[in-house]
Amino acid sequence: MPHNFGDFRATGTVYLVGAGPGDPELLTLKALRLVRAADAIVYDQLVSPQILAFARTGAQTIFVGKKPGAFCCPQRDIEGTLLRLAREGKTVVRLKGGDPFVFGRGGEEAEALAAAGIAFEIVPGVTSALGAASYTGIPLTHREHSSAVVFLTGHEDPKKTDSSFRWEDYGRLDATLCIYMGMKNLESITRRLQAGGLASDTPAAVIQSATTGAHRQFVGTVGDIALASERAGFGAPAIVIVGNVVRLASKLAWFEANRAHALPS
Ligand code: SAH
């Protein structure tokens, strides 16, 4: 029991919240309620400013994202920030792009909170592969084309050895592949998928800044997508989708079509 009741303040709760892929309307009602109520919001660079604008006046907003090419915040510091804010009795929202448990290091942050005995909740978000697929008109499964979906990262923890990730095996899966953080290594990834047996004419798409005003999509084949998308100026943040379902984008690409027909504002 604290010896001085005047100093006592209950520890706050940390909410690990998915902000979705970009379009603020893809935020869940629960995420919106928590963002509005938070005393402190600790956010990444992929969180849209329109979502941060929902924070209440006076809420503390703390950026912990990594700027491209620069190193901002070691994971241990981010975890330390969450613990400190909670111990100050604050309601903390840790806002992450997409879903906190899909390549978002939400697991590590939840582990740190659990180890420190801080109360936490996880609020799922629309992960960017789902946002990219829907807005590009690529059904990730389809009774005629694909019965399985895999989420993969093209950029592993540098501490892991190369052999721990066998792209050749994924080339044999006959599944839709959704590759996060794949742009830098796309040439080698697509080469290794083909070495595993994936036909070079399998359709592939790169979707950059999916669901946002800057959304761009590029469709090619596994054989040519790396070079062709680079030549077309595509880069991170982008999702690469590989599989026969990508063919449907030529019929179902509603988002680009609607934008093309929209009157200039
Ligand atoms: N937790 C996030 C993923 C974070 S890793 C999620 O669930 O989506 C960061 C990677 O996510 C980026 O390199 C990119 O591959 C992908 N990404 C995030 N937002 C994106 C967007 N709007 N469009 C395309 N890819 C996106």
Per-region residue spans from a language model:
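Class I S-adenosyl-L-methionine
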Residues: 1-24, 29-126, 226
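Active-site catalytic pocket residues across diverse enzymes, especially alpha/beta-hydrolases
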Residues: 55, 136, 193, 197
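Hydrophobic packing residues within well-ordered alpha-helices of enzyme cores
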Residues: 51-52, 113, 132-133, 189, ...
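Short hydrophobic/aromatic-enriched beta-strand-loop microsegments
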Residues: 59-66, 117-121, 140-150, 197-206
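Conserved active-site and cofactor/substrate-binding residues in soluble primary-metabolism enzymes
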Residues: 26, 30, 36, 46, ...
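A contiguous loop/helix-start segment that scaffolds small-molecule binding in enzyme catalytic cores
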Residues: 2-5, 11-14, 88-92, 148, ...
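Class I SAM-dependent methyltransferase SAM-binding "motif I" and its flanking Rossmann-like core
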Residues: 3-4, 97-173, 216-219
